[in-house]
Amino acid sequence: MKVLKSIYKVMGCAILAASLSSCVNDWLDVAPSDGTDAGAALTSSSDLDAARTGMYKALKGNSSLVDYYGQQFFVYGDVHAGDDYQYNYIGGSNRANFYYDMNYQTASEFNTSTVSWQSPYVVIGRANRIIAAAEGGKLSDAVEAKAKIEQYAAESKVLRALAHFDLVRIYGKPYTEDQGASLGVPLVIGVLESNAKPARSTVAEVYTQVVKDLTEAISSNALATETKPGYVSVWGAKAILSRVYLNMGDYANALSVAEDIIKNSGAALWTRDQYFKAWDASTPNESEFLFRLNVAGSDDNNDLNGIGNLQQRDGYKEMVATKKFVDMLTSDPKDVRNDMFLPATASKEVEKYGTNKVFLNKLRGQGGDLRNVTIVPIIRLSEVYLTAAECAFRNNDKTKAVEYLNDLVKNRTTTEAFLATVDNITLERILIERRKELIGEGQRYFDALRNNETITRYTSEADKGWHKTLSKEAQSFNRDYFKAIAAIPQAEINANPNIKQNTGYGE
């Protein structure tokens, strides 16, 4: 597959030729299933509309390209940690074991089946194409379609920011480790010349651009104020911005944005009675979703390789909750999130996991069809409450931290002992609640890195929980271990000598 060459063809130019395989390059080099020629000029708002569809499709992926929110980003964000959600080595089929086993040594092992690289840059390329056309002033209906054009440009800036943000968290050190001084990823914020070979920007430079894109989109007042499934609104943009500030350790700004969402978005936490049914793909409860993808139908589903089928007991069943996580969650039998898991049924898995509920049942698919996972969460209101609680605590406002944490907990359990007080609230307590709430949504690993946690799968062969035997380095590690961040795919290094590889990886 052509990695950045294909990406920049989507932008209207070809650079950084690289070849990994030939499985999906046709999808990138021709019209992106959006009714537009990838190299044709955008001359009207209707052209932008079609290009916008292609941009969102790249975020979701398809059955051949699942290296972003179609599958791989969620696997990376949860299974690379492996302390709450592990590879199911009993019944899995090696689709989610790469970052769990951590046996990789060379950059050539990183490609679209193992890491998010190509698709985020496709999103960026398509976003740049829309922004350039929208802001170029040459669209045939620039006056009469002004509001629509500005909205599409603002959405494109949000998705460009999201893709850069996700990339820099995978390939760069956490911002909180060195205030962004180390290398991040190439910033692509416009159409590049055909001979361009961009170097990696620093983590700080990438974050600066991410914040700039998000704040410009928000302040443009062009984003929709009503949240609609499949598209980003002003509240989705603000939620992403709050997450970005949190990852930067900018707790004051993260709290400010989170509180704006809580007070003014009109979104509401699911109640305990609503929680399980809210994830029903046929009749989803939208009140918590600030930004989710709408994957439905043969045009944009990820077929059996999608994240829903990977998680589900009746699908590829690649991942299971760890014993440590199950013990943590079941310590409160009245917590409704216990209902989000199913027990094993296959004999070998029953032998290993017993009657414990280990298979996550969030992404259930529409009508039982696990290829049509219509609910793919990018960010929910519950995360915003947890961000507000964490940031208030870090800013020494325990009263406010208790308020936001308990607002969530009261909607998940009736056990009063799990409610926090000013006297007993701790950062650990807030982070544990975050783990319970967001499992399977791709955030655990990044939270561990930004907080400089030691990720511990197990430390004793005599007490491994449900883990298989792992290398010593994979049993317990922190962000100092070179494998804590991914290698830049070797094909990119070969094509562009300006891209420096992450330390520790051979070819």
PLM regions with names:
Residues 1-21:
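Sec-dependent bacterial lipoprotein signal peptides
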Residues 3, 22-78, 277-279, 311-316, ...:
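Membrane-proximal, proline-rich intrinsically disordered regions
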Residues 34-42, 66-88, 172-181, 185, ...:
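Short, surface-exposed recognition loops and adjoining beta-strand edges that mediate ligand/DNA contacts
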Residues 45, 50-52, 60-63, 205, ...:
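Extended ligand-binding clefts on enzyme/binding-domain cores
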Residues 93-171, 201, 219-223, 371-376, ...:
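Conserved, well-structured interaction surfaces
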